[in-house]
Amino acid sequence: MDGKEKLHIMRTLMKERGYDAYIIPHGDCHDNEYIAEADERIKFISNFSGSNGLGLVTQDVALMWTDGRYFIQIEKELYPGWQMKKMREEESLADYVLNNLEEGATIGMDYSLFSVDSASRIKDKLCKYSIVDDKNNIIDDIWGTIKPKYKTNKLLILSEKFTGKKVSEKYEMLNKMLTKGDDIENYRLLVSRLDDIAWLLNLRGSDIPYNPVFFSYALFCKNKGQFCTKLFINKEKLDTPEMKKYCEDNHIILFNYDEIIPELEKSEENMITFFDEESTNYRMFQTLKEINVGRISRLDQDYIEVIKSIKNEVEIEGYRKANIKDSVALIKFFSWMEEELVTKNRTDLNEYQIGLKNKEVREEQENYMGESFAPICGCGANAAIIHYEQNENLHSDMNKNLIILCDTGAQYKEGTTDITRTVHYGKPTQKEKEMYTRVLLGNLSLERLQFKSGKTLYSLDAIPRSYLYMVGEDYKHGTSHGVGHFLNVHEGPHGLPLIPGNIITNEPGYYEKDNFGIRIENEVLVVVKNEEKKLYGFENLTFIPYERNLIDMDLISNDFKKYIDDFHKQCWDKLSPLLKNDKKALDYLKRKTAPL
């Protein structure tokens, strides 16, 4: 079934169901950014594989909105018959509907794939249209029997040695935030986000590629001072004596996954049901509104997300260890790649093979649990595709005379990593050196910054961009995102003030379509720099040397040169003892950390 046939079938089904238009989100019932293969509806219907897409199909057009990270990629991927729309640069989906569809037109959308917040915004803006819940998802009906199945792998218990907190302690933390000191004796909190559930229960899964989570809903309950979690899940995942005892010890009561709606409907007169608009899907919200007993209370944010974003001391030390492991692995990787491309002058090496080698060197590390996202290894023009994803059938050959960008990460029991380095093994152009240096200066300026408490990531965002602004350039992605603890590599909350204990990335970049791309990414920890003046700053956790071959010395002050030299000395001091039995990697590290 090709793309043209899929669209034809979809439009036929739309006519049968009375839909003038249909909205397709990238997502699932749990508000996941990264989704299981069985939920990749946008990819199935349009061939676009990015993690942010919003589609609209009518009888005349098929449109796909995405953000700046994917502008280059989406042009290459969309099936014929689809048209790209640029988020924040062109009219929004809602504006397109207002400008092109008659009032009263019927629009179908699967309510279970939209959060309360996003569905409400669509319905409010399109209030003169008939918005219908497509309960038998139209894409799934086209997909039919060839749709992939959801995984049923067993769960992993993550011990307190790695989490730093028992489940019972997390129950107390969550209760304190929910009740805000009030004596509320009978409540339940609906938890939909999979990483929230995994964090709360100190459990990990493998239902979604690269994300150690498992499909489930949870009701965190308090009744007369006693806590428990009702977990709605495929029970096969916990069908071991060890897991049954763990659930009993931590007051986890098991239900089948599809029992969440009936259980929600069993409210009590004096019970409060809490939920948050950002993660609860709209169909679930419709169920909550129909409950006649008890009280429904909307939360202003995802409280578990807020708590888990502030890492405890055990988790922080875990991130430090995970990043050292990753730095060791990546020194081995880059030294291998240099030898293959320069010393051996190989011309048969491709991006896909590079990605496989990157995974191989990490697998040598203790407590390695897998990659944290699909490796991005782009050479030359492919480096300009921000979320480029090479594979066995789609890749380019490596070339030592072109820029090579490697954005990769790993899952360790101690923590999650996300690191990007850009290298060049030949003679870079002056433009490449200038733009690399500007990106590096932006990265280091953010890392060295001290700022008042209360500042958000957004409020600091202009600082790493400033060296690009000087020459009229910018990049179309965020500079930072939170990172989960052996959880999702992208973690919220977004827009809240930075707090000591937050782990975030620092990743400015520059991208020139059909030419080259640059990104430099470290993980950093928010720390207190001056307690008396309430000044915060960052502790860098990533120890991979910068690409001296791409640094334009004329653009860097002596102060920055010293800062880079000091950083390179740290790289040598921390990594050289761990590489003493690998002469090739040790020699590479020594050369790359020599004073500028």
What do these predicted ranges mean?
Residues M1-L596:
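Active-site neighborhoods and metal-handling regions in enzymes and metal-associated proteins
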